[in-house]
C-alpha cells in the first residue's frame, strides 16, 4: 500500500473521530511523507499545526495507523521546511510503506515515559470547579498506586482533560519509581492487540504484557462494548491486576452504567473503586488555560483577544487550545498583529459552525430517557413493554435524523439490534408524526433540546 493510500484511509477515519473544525484546521491538508523504522513522518505546511498535532493528536493518529497498516507506527508531524533536515539523502517520494522487521516489532511495546506526552503533567493541568475532584483523585492514585482508589474511573466529554490526567499519573508514578512498569493504552489498541495475539498464536505473550505490570491506564473503555471476547480477556486481566494490588485507571465518555452491551461483571468491577466525572470548564478556568498556554509558549497576545476566545469557545479544552493555535497561525500567515477583530475573523468558522459539537446517540438516549422516564440502560435491554419500546423507537428515529451514524452503528448502541429494527423504528415514528400533530410537537421539542445539549 502506498503512502498516499495509507494516508487517505487515515484521514477518512480521522474525519469521523474528530470535530469538523479540528479536522479541517489541522489535519485536512497534511501529507504522509514516509514510514520507516516504526515512525510515520507527516508533512504540515504550518509550523503551529505541526506542533499542535504532535501535542494533541499523535495518540489518536497512532491508533488509526495501527488499524490501517496492522502494526505499531508512531506519527511525527514536521513542516515542509524541516523535511530537508529529515530526508538525509532519502528518495523524495517513497512508493511503498515498509513494515518493520520482526526484530523491531516483536518488543516495540513501551513501558516507560516515552508513551506519555511530555506536556501532560500535573504541573501543567489547570484546575477549576469542573475538574478539581478528578485531579485530586488522580494525584492520590499517582502518589500511592493501588492504595487509594482502585480502579479509578474517570469519565467526561471529549477534550476535557481525561487523557491529560492519565498521562500525568504515568509521569508521577515514574517520577517516584523509575522502575515501575506502566502501560498506557486505549481500548481500541487493546482490542487490536488481542485480535493479533489470537491470529498469531501469541496469547501467552499478550497476557504476560498486560498482567505483569504495576499500573494499567486504559483510555476510552466504552469502545469494548459489544466485543464479547475482548471483554472476557479484559475481565481476567482486570482480576489479575486487582488481586495483585496493581493500579488500574480507566477513562470513558460516560459512566459504567451507561455503557451499553457491557457485561455486568465488568460493570460491577468498574464501580468497585472511585468514579469521577470531568465537566466543561467555566469562564475563569478557560481564561486560566489560555493564559498558561501563552506563558508556556512565550506568546504576546492581548487580554481582550483571550477574553474573546474564552467567551466564544466553551465546549472543551482541546477546542479552546485549538482556537488559540488557529489564531496564531492566521496572524502569522497574514502578517497581521493579533487584535479582537483579527481573532473574530480567524475563528468565524468555528464560532458560526452549527455542528461544532457533534450530537451523540448517548445525548439522544439521555434526553429521550429523561422525558419518558426510561433509564438509559433500558434502551439496550431486551424489554418490549410499550413504556420502553416506544421511547426506544423515538430515540432510534432521532439518532438517524440527527447523527451521521450508520444503521448498524445505531443498532449497536441500542443493545446490538439489527439495522432492520432501526429502519422499522424510523418508518413507524415517521408515520406517527404525520398522523398526530401533538406527538409531532413533542418530538420537535425533544429535537430542540438535543440540539442545545
Curated annotation (Swiss-Prot):
It comes from Staphylococcus aureus (strain MRSA252). SMART domains: AAA, Bac_DnaA_C. SUPFAM superfamilies: P-loop containing nucleoside triphosphate hydrolases, TrpR-like. Transmembrane segments: none annotated. Keywords: ATP-binding, Cytoplasm, DNA replication, DNA-binding, Lipid-binding, Nucleotide-binding. The lineage of its organism: Bacteria, Bacillati, Bacillota, Bacilli, Bacillales. This is Chromosomal replication initiator protein DnaA. GO terms for molecular function: ATP binding; ATP hydrolysis activity; DNA replication origin binding; lipid binding. InterPro entries: AAA+_ATPase (IPR003593), Chromosome_initiator_DnaA (IPR001957), Chromosome_initiator_DnaA-like (IPR020591), Chromosome_initiator_DnaA_CS (IPR018312), DnaA_C (IPR013159), DnaA_dom (IPR013317), DnaA_N_dom (IPR024633), DnaA_N_sf (IPR038454). ATP binds at residues 159, 161-163. Domain I is involved in oligomerization and binding regulators, domain II is flexibile and of varying length in different bacteria, domain III forms the AAA+ region, while domain IV binds dsDNA.
Amino acid at each position: 500500500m502506498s503512502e498516499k493510500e495509507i494516508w487517505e484511509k487515515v484521514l477518512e477515519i480521522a474525519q469521523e473521530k474528530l470535530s469538523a473544525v479540528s479536522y479541517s484546521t489541522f489535519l485536512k491538508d497534511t501529507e504522509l511523507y514516509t514510514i520507516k523504522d516504526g515512525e510515520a513522518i507527516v508533512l504540515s505546511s504550518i509550523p503551529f499545526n505541526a506542533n499542535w498535532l504532535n501535542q494533541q493528536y499523535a495518540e489518536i493518529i497512532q491508533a488509526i495507523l495501527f488499524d490501517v497498516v496492522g502494526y505499531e507506527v508512531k506519527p511525527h508531524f514536521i513542516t515542509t521546511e524541516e523535511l530537508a533536515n529529515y530526508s538525509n539523502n532519502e528518495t523524495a517520494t517513497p512508493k511503498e510503506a515498509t513494515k518493520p522487521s520482526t526484530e523491531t516489532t516483536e518488543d516495540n511495546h513501551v513501558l516507560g515515559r516515552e508513551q506519555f506526552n511530555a506536556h501532560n503533567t500535573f504541573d501543567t493541568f489547570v484546575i477549576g470547579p469542573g475538574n478539581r475532584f478528578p485531579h485530586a483523585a488522580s494525584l492520590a492514585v499517582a502518589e500511592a498506586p493501588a492504595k487509594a482508589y482502585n480502579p479509578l474511573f474517570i469519565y467526561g466529554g471529549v477534550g476535557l482533560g481525561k487523557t491529560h490526567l492519565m498521562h500525568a499519573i504515568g509521569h508521577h508514578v515514574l517520577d517516584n519509581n523509575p522502575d515501575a512498569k506502566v502501560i498506557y493504552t486505549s481500548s481500541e489498541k487493546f482490542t487490536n492487540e488481542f485480535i493479533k495475539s489470537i491470529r498469531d498464536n501469541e496469547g501467552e505473550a499478550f497476557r504476560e504484557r498486560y498482567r505483569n505490570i504495576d499500573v494499567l491506564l486504559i483510555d476510552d473503555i466504552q469502545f469494548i462494548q459489544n466485543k464479547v471476547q475482548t471483554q472476557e480477556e479484559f475481565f481476567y486481566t482486570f482480576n489479575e491486576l486487582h488481586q495483585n494490588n496493581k493500579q488500574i485507571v480507566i477513562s470513558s465518555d460516560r459512566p459504567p452504567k451507561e455503557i451499553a452491551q457491557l457485561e455486568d461483571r465488568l460493570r460491577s468491577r468498574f464501580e468497585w473503586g472511585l468514579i469521577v466525572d470531568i465537566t466543561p470548564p467555566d469562564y475563569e478556568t478557560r481564561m486560566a488555560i489560555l493564559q498558561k498556554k501563552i506563558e508556556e509558549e512565550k506568546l504576546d497576545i492581548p487580554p481582550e483577544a483571550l477574553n474573546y476566545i474564552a467567551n466564544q469557545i466553551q465546549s472543551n479544552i482541546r477546542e479552546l487550545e485549538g482556537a488559540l493555535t488557529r489564531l496564531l497561525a492566521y496572524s502569522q500567515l497574514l502578517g497581521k498583529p493579533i487584535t479582537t477583530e483579527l481573532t473574530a475573523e480567524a475563528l468565524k468558522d468555528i464560532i458560526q459552525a452549527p455542528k461544532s459539537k457533534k450530537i451523540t446517540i448517548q445525548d439522544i438516549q439521555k434526553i429521550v430517557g429523561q422525558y419518558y422516564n426510561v433509564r438509559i440502560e433500558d434502551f439496550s435491554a431486551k424489554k418490549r413493554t410499550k413504556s420502553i419500546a416506544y421511547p426506544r423507537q423515538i430515540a432510534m428515529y432521532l439518532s438517524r435524523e440527527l447523527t451521521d451514524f450508520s444503521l448498524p452503528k445505531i443498532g449497536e448502541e441500542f443493545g446490538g439490534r439489527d439495522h432492520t429494527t432501526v429502519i422499522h423504528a424510523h418508518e413507524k415514528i415517521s408515520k406517527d408524526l404525520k398522523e398526530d400533530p401533538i406527538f409531532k410537537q413533542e418530538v420537535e421539542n425533544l429535537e430542540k433540546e438535543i440540539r442545545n445539549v
